[in-house]
């Protein structure tokens, strides 16, 4: 059993990740500069969109990977979708670590603690349902 990633999968992750990171930068910059959004709000929107995309990818690939097992070319196409769109694009687009940097660079320590608690609540209350909704939309 081969548990390592193939070169094609690695290239798919790199291509998706670069595209996702560039898209995140464009959207985050646009929301902050053109609409005056605070950094945490723009990053929350980015992460919410990325989480829905991940749910869509997970839902689609989980439904179609099972059916593609009999066809080699269809199976290979399906096999590359998750590394490209799930790990790469959605992973590069979402930026939970940047949110934590924004939280921890706040000047008042009390706001840092509130930010961490707030992110934990938001992750459970918003992002998990968004992932689930994306998977439902994809038919999983």
From Swiss-Prot:
Keywords of the record, alphabetical order, are: Cell membrane, Ion channel, Ion transport, Membrane, Metal-binding, Sodium, Transmembrane, Transmembrane helix, Transport
Q: Could you say how this protein's activity is regulated? A: Na(+) is not transported, but it plays an essential structural role and its presence is essential for fluoride channel function.
Q: Which residues bind Na(+)?
A: 91, 94
How does the protein's chain sit in the membrane according to the entry? Multi-pass membrane protein
InterPro entries for the chain = FluC
From the record, give the transmembrane residue ranges.
Answer: 3-23, 38-58, 80-100, 113-133
What superkingdom heads the lineage?
Bacteria
Principal place where this protein is found? membrane
Cellular component per GO, a single term: plasma membrane
Subcellular location per the Swiss-Prot or TrEMBL entry = Cell membrane
The entry sums up its family as follows: Belongs to the fluoride channel Fluc/FEX (TC 1.A.43) family.
The UniProt function text for this chain reads: Fluoride-specific ion channel. Important for reducing fluoride concentration in the cell, thus reducing its toxicity.
Write down what this protein is called: Fluoride-specific ion channel FluC 1
Tell me the organism. Corynebacterium jeikeium (strain K411)
């Amino acid at each position: 059993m081969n548990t390592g990633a193939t070169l094609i999968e690695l290239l798919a992750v790199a291509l998706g990740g670069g595209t996702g990171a560039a898209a995140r930068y464009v959207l985050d910059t646009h929301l902050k500069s053109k609409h005056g959004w605070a950094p945490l709000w723009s990053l929350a929107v980015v992460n919410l969109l990325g989480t829905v995309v991940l749910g869509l990818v997970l839902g689609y690939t989980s439904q179609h990977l099972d059916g593609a097992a009999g066809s080699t070319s269809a199976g290979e196409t399906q096999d590359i979708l998750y590394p490209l769109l799930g790990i790469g694009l959605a992973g590069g687009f979402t930026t939970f670590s940047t949110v934590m940097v924004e939280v921890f660079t706040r000047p008042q320590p009390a706001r840092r603690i509130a930010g961490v608690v707030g992110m934990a609540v938001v992750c459970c209350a918003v992002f998990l349902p968004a992932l689930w909704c994306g998977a439902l939309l994809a038919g999983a």
